[in-house]
Structures are given as C-alpha cells and as structure tokens.
From Swiss-Prot:
Entry's family note: Belongs to the PhnJ family.
Transmembrane spans: none
Protein name, per record: Alpha-D-ribose 1-methylphosphonate 5-phosphate C-P-lyase
Superkingdom as given in the UniProt entry: Bacteria
Family annotation (InterPro entries): PhnJ
Species of origin: Rhizobium meliloti (strain 1021)
Amino acid sequence: MNDLATYNFAYLDEQTKRMIRRAILKAIAIPGYQVPFASREMPMPYGWGTGGVQVTASILGPDDVLKVIDQGADDTTNAVSIRAFFQKVADVAVTTRTTEATIIQTRHRIPEEQLREGQTLVYQVPIPEPLRFLEPRETETRKMHALEEYGLMHVKLYEDIARNGHIATTYAYPVKVEGRYVMDPSPTPKFDNPKMHMSEALQLFGAGREKRIYAVPPYTEVVSLDFEDHPFEVQKFDKPCALCGAENVYLDEVVLDDKGGRMFVCSDTDHCEDRRAHGHAGAMLAPAAKESQEAAE
C-alpha cells in the first residue's frame, strides 16, 4: 500500500482544499468581494494566521518555494512557526528571499521588492469587513456592499480631518478595488497601499476566524479612499534606515537603551540584508564598514 494514500499534503484534506479553491476562484472573479468559506480548525489559535495558512495550504504545490513574513521580518515567532509547519507537513522549499519565492504569506506588510508575475501574496487577515467598526451588524454591511453605499466610510475619514486636520488612519486604510468594492487591505500600514495597485502578483486574503476569503487579481486597480482637497498620502520618515541607509521604505522604531536611545530600521528584513550585502551602510553600520574597508586596503 502506498503511504501517500493516507497522507494529506500540506495538512488539509483534498475535499477541504477543493472547497477553499472554489472560494478563491470566486474571489478572483469578483475582486474585493468577501467570499464565505467553511474555515477549518488548524493547529494554531485563531488570530495567529489560520486563514492565511488555509489559503496557502490549498494552493501550495511540491515545486513551490515558500516565504513567510511577520510585519516584514522573516525571523519573528509567527513567521518561524508557520514556515516550520509547512516544512513539516509539505516538505517544500522555503526561503527568506522575496525574489526566489513563488508564494509569500504575510502578516501586516507587503515586501519592498516589487512582486512579479507568477508570485502569490497571501495575507493573514484578522477582520475582513472594512465597515465593522462603523456598522457592527453583518446583515447591514452586506447590504451596504451590495448597494455600494460607502458614505459611512467617507464620513469616518472626514471626521479624521475635522479632528486632526488630516486623515489620521495609518493602517488598515480602506481601498476601492476595480471601482466597485471597498476592501480592508488587512492591518498593513497605509504606506503599502500603493503597492497593491496594478501589482503583477496575485493577492489573496484569508480570514480564518471570520470565515472569509477575498482577492485582488494581477493588474487590478486599487485606489485608497480620499478627498480632492485631502488626497491620500503615505507616511514619511525623517531619517533613512540606520543599518542599510534605505530611503522611501517603511521603517520600524527600535529602542536601544533606557535613556531614550533609538534607531529606525527597515521593516522588511530581506530588503535590508540585500542592500547591506551590496555594500550599502546606514549610520549605525557606517563606522564599522569604513574600518573593515581600511583593514582590507
């Protein structure tokens, strides 16, 4: 008897994968629309990426190369545990390089490296409904999506302007997909929103606890909501990355000591490591880089 006959590749059984793939196909056909699916119990608690893991398990093949990131980093707890999980249940190749991966599962970030055709970005989504905190009743939000009644969302953004003088929302910033559905891009910083627009990669969103899947196909128009007199703007950082000197990237603040010392470094660890490998150095590494260069000479 073949041992593979009783083995489920990538943990989920084939009937479950088929059901999730049907939901994915419907989501791709209707960009931004939340497709219900029968979420399964996974060997991790809800809120730790069960939706993204189920989507990844359903599309993962033996020849795929998997990359998992958590807020841009490859070495954080969530990323390491999910990567180890798929290595164990699927024995697929894994990588930390964005350019080498065919499937990238992410929590709260989009890689700085521009994604290409053939790649798939799988988002872990805690709350898929962009109107949830404005209208908690699911029956009402479904009607609002069906009738394209998104005035409430614009009122929320206007209230930001009235209170703060600008739109203060910095993450989970709502977008309109292909001129139709308003979508929650998951709690990614609004810095990443422009990367979703006309991306060459397929973007899939899985919410396990909420039992929803939605998608943005390649080359799809994704526009962040704004006003003519208050256009959408991304966050700006005053300093470059302290390790690689990169500018125009999303930075994380790192506390260095208990005296107020801090530095800002690339959220995307692969992007930062790649730049340093090519000789770039930020303020924190510049002295060490200079010393090593002088020693080599």
